[in-house]
Every structure is written in C-alpha cells, then in structure tokens.
C-alpha cells in the first residue's frame, strides 16, 4: 500500500460553476435546531411521529415485510485492481463495485478514488447490532494498491464508517478525504487531518506529484473534485439530524480547464444517497409515475448539475432502499427516479449502487435491477450498455 506514494496538494481557491442564486445558500437553515435543509418543493420533512404511526398501522394490518436474503444470488468475484498506477494501457475509466454505495474508480490519468467506503460487516454504530451484510465484501482496504482521494457523500452509517476510514488513513497515509460541510471536525476527532470540507457548488483541485527525493519522476496527476447538491438528510444520532451537509460529487481528471492538448477529461458523477421527488401514500395498484402524478415536483438540482458539469463519462447512481415508497421517496431514489437523474445529469453511462448489501428497505432484495431495466425501457433506452448493474467486485471499463 505504501509504495509509490505521491505528494498531495489541495487548492480550494477554485472558481466552480454554480446556478444563479447559489450564493444565497438557501440550503443553510437560518433558524431552529437544524443547520441544513433541502430547499426544494420536491422535498418534505420526515415527521418521526408520522413514520411511527405508518409502521404501526402496517404491522397491525399484517403488511409488514422483512425481505428475505436467502435467494439473493448477486454475482461475486474478487476484483482485479491495477497493481501499477499507469498500467491501464487504455483511456478507459475502470469502476469496481465494492458493495452498497462504495465504488473504487481508476482514472486514465492515474488518479485512484474511493467513494463512500464501508468495509465492515454491519452499517451501524456497533458491529454487535444493526443491519448485517448479506453479500460478501469483495476486498479489504489492504487489497487496494493505490488510493489518492476518498469522497464521502454524508454521515449515515451505511456511507461513512469510522473503522473503515481509520484503516484507510493507516494503510494509505497520503489519501485525502473530501467531505460535505460540517464533517471535518468528526474526521479530526478520529485522528484524520488530511480532509477538505466543501459546500454545494464548491470545488477543490487535487494535485499528485513525485516526492522531491524520488528517483522516478512523473507528470503531475490533477483532478477537480466538486461538491454538488443531493436531496437527503444526515445524522449519526437522534440529536444530530441535519447538522452536517449531504452531497453528490463530480470528479474530473484532469480538470476541464487544465486538460491541455490531447488530454481527454474523464469525469464521474457520484450520486451519493438521494431522493428525487416526494410522493403521497398511494393505493397498491397505483404507480407514482402515472400520468396523474406528473405534476409532482422533482429535485431541480440534477438538471442544473448536468447543464453546468455534464456530460459525465460515468454516473454512479442509487437504485435501492425505496420501499415503503411514501416514506422513502424524499430520501431514496427508486429505479425510475434513478433513470430520470441519469438523464438530468447528462451521464453518458451509469452503474447502479445502493442495493444488494444491507436490507434497508422493504422491497425484495432482487427487485431493483429488474425495475431498472423496466425504467430504461419505459424511457426508450437500451436495457443493457447504458445504465447497468454490475456484480460485486466486477471491474467495468467505460471508454472516454
């Protein structure tokens, strides 16, 4: 892990494109206990009492379900990660799904980025209780040869793991963490100081270069990492709700304004954990994408992201944990929502995530990929080769 360590520098003085009015920072809560909020009509707050009442009603009406994982036959393989930083030999982006929202991405420039790593059995405050992984972890932190940047979407336990980030900092001491606003102090308390904290529509330039004493000199590897909006919530305890920000991210290497002649930019949009539109409680036979619900507002941020930062080489987009729909829709996209986000953000290709690892919703654990194919067909898109589901540990090559 520690061979071929490159010096890392981060510059936050970056002029990042932002939509009109972004300087008002309307997602910053001005009053009350919360620090941040979702500022769009596509959101409605999750009322804890309403959630309790809904779950109680479902229990008494015998509609409570806990999905079985017995038949969850998700393809698995040990990932083949490049052992040489520049051994790719092509201009492909290589993306490897490590479970749930964790992807390891190898850029043609030599950059290596890990998104939302949770490499523990459970996603909870303790490894003694909480949701338990029902599929095998493809690899451990020690199996990752190079790691330059770790990008975190938010602080929920299925996206931010204390044991995992501490191990990363130990085994990859020069890896730099990029986090949404309000999370830096948590990392410092965990003994991790190589952290850059960003607000929505803020970016930073990452530069990797050969150490001064190194005999092997390389051209600097450059990337621009930009914090972008998502529709979600945060909190690692009941008293910490929405006191830190949640985000999606753009990673482009090299930065678009520094690509130079002959250097093609590889760009990845990481959706993190996000909803797309709040929906009402429906009758069992209804679909919230039926024509009669066409006026329900959608989150406008994704279209803004596509206009300002697209097209993206690759999108990493969530497709699971969407049932019960009326409760989950504000915070978790279902496959139909995910296809809309794919289109809004102008991703050329996409890979699915946020499914197949922990039971976090009521849907059948095998259902998200099936519904994704249906959603693609509904929009007139190919079922394969556009927005795909990959196996655990599978390395997918995306040409530029």
Curated annotation (Swiss-Prot):
An example Gene Ontology CC term for this record: cytoplasm
Entry annotated with the keyword Hydrolase: yes
Keywords assigned: Hydrolase
InterPro entries, alphabetized: Metallo-B-lactamas, NAPE-PLD, RibonucZ/Hydroxyglut_hydro
Induction (UniProt): Expression is positively regulated by the leucinostatins biosynthesis cluster-specific transcription regulator lcsF.
Annotated region described as Disordered, given as residue ranges: 1-31
GO molecular function: N-acylphosphatidylethanolamine-specific phospholipase D activity; zinc ion binding
Pathway it works in: Secondary metabolite biosynthesis
A biological process term (GO) from this entry: N-acylethanolamine metabolic process
Transmembrane residue ranges: none
EC numbers, comma separated: 3.-.-.-
A Pfam family per the record: Lactamase_B_2
Extent of Basic and acidic residues compositional bias: 1-14
Role: Metal-dependent hydrolase; part of the gene cluster that mediates the biosynthesis of the lipopeptide antibiotics leucinostatins that show extensive biological activities, including antimalarial, antiviral, antibacterial, antifungal, and antitumor activities, as well as phytotoxic.
Family: Belongs to the UPF0173 family.
Identification of the protein by name: Metal-dependent hydrolase lscR
Gene that this sequence comes from: lcsR
